[in-house]
Amino acid sequence: MNDDKKDFVGRDLYQLIRNAKDKIKIDYKFWYTQPVPKINDEFDENVNEPFISDNKVEDVRKEEYKLPSGYAWCVCDITKENDRSDIYNLLTDNYVEDDDNVFRFNYSSEFLLWALSSPNYVKNWHIGVKYESTNKLVGFISAIPIDMCVNKNIIKMAEVNFLCVHKSLRSKRLAPVLIKEITRRINLESIWQAIYTAGVYLPKPISTARYFHRSINVKKLIEIGFSCLNTRLTMSRAIKLYRIDDTLNIKNLRLMKKKDIDGLQKLLNEHLKQYNLHAIFSKEDVAHWFTPIDQVIYTYVNEENGEIKDLISFYSLPSKVLGNNKYNILNAAFSFYNITTTTTFKNLIQDAICLAKRNNFDVFNALEVMDNYSVFQDLKFGEGDGSLKYYLYNWKCASCHPSKIGIVLL
């Protein structure tokens, strides 16, 4: 990356992503009581097994974990607008913001419904903590079921996400209680493994991946303080440097339709086999995760002779812009799954950026997982200043390079 590009990536959206995961910092003392690797543990490639393998549902604690006086457990019904609104308000005010309090993730109600209502989701895995005197939601954690493949071993897991505790209650150490309670409820369904990500380093990641950003609306990114200029990089030069060609390399790309589900399932599962860690998608999974929803998930396919040959997908996660008189929203697209069999991967991601621009996104973000890193320099992505760690719960295996990670968690 040349100096101009390095200087241009000033305020980094990764700061938001990292802080979203860092808000709850749990010391290692708690994690050393859990079936996860210790900091100094190293496993060779032949190790691929649970830490604890003799679990039985009848041995799982039947009663909920005790909360501090004045607080009560609740189940958040993701199908109800009021419950989604409570989750939205908690996350908006307490889950994500950058150090300068300029950007805050803005999870829409529709996004939360998409993220948490996957096929066969378990209602009571959407766990809330309410302050009894006001009935206000002050804590939340969620999980959804997922079929994972770890080094060719297929495992039913829970994907854990959205751990959030109100800022005023951080001293009450609610986060470990939330984690233990979600673990208990997952175990009651005879599921003993989980996958999760965090910006903070915990015992111990299976892999670590950095975020990279491709500027789209250059002028806006500079005006809101997301990116910056310098003496060598003027506004006009920056706009020219990051100009996006509006012509697609794959001419027949179109929005995914219901009739594409079978072909897309085949393309996805066949492609993902090459990675050490990946999900296995059922037809119902494909329908849920990839059917386009405006301002939530964008999926484009190229169909040739009745077969799905290429896939582009990205999801929308905007941020509120605070204290700016001209703009109040930063529209960010996040790379999801992208597969090509007819062109180069560079051409595919170039088309993804073009489609993000057509849908009025300001920036296109991607982790260095799967094949993504190979195109970042050529397509003028800027490197983020932090990393996202991938973790497995109750599973021991060798760590791997992020290019061998084949899953994107929201």
Swiss-Prot record:
Keywords for this protein: Acyltransferase, Cytoplasm, Transferase
Chief location bin: cytoplasm
CC annotations in GO: cytosol
Source domain of life: Eukaryota
Catalysis performed (reactions): N-terminal glycyl-[protein] + tetradecanoyl-CoA = N-tetradecanoylglycyl-[protein] + CoA + H(+)
One BP term from GO: N-terminal peptidyl-glycine N-myristoylation
Coiled coil: none
Subunit and interaction comment: Heterodimer composed of NMT and AK2; AK2 myristoylation stabilizes the complex.
Cellular localisation: Cytoplasm
SUPFAM superfamilies: Acyl-CoA N-acyltransferases (Nat)
EC number in record: 2.3.1.97
Binding site for tetradecanoyl-CoA: 30-31, 162-165, 171, 173-175
Protein family (similarity comment): Belongs to the NMT family.
Keyword Acyltransferase appears in the UniProt entry: yes
Name of the protein in its database record: Glycylpeptide N-tetradecanoyltransferase
Function recorded in the entry: Adds a myristoyl group to the N-terminal glycine residue of certain cellular proteins. Myristoylates adenylate kinase AK2. During the asexual blood stage, may myristoylate proteins such as ARO, CDPK1 and GAP45. Probably by mediating protein myristoylation, plays a role in the assembly of the inner membrane complex during the early stages of schizogony and in the formation of rhoptries in the late stages and thus merozoite egress.
Entry GO MF terms: glycylpeptide N-tetradecanoyltransferase activity
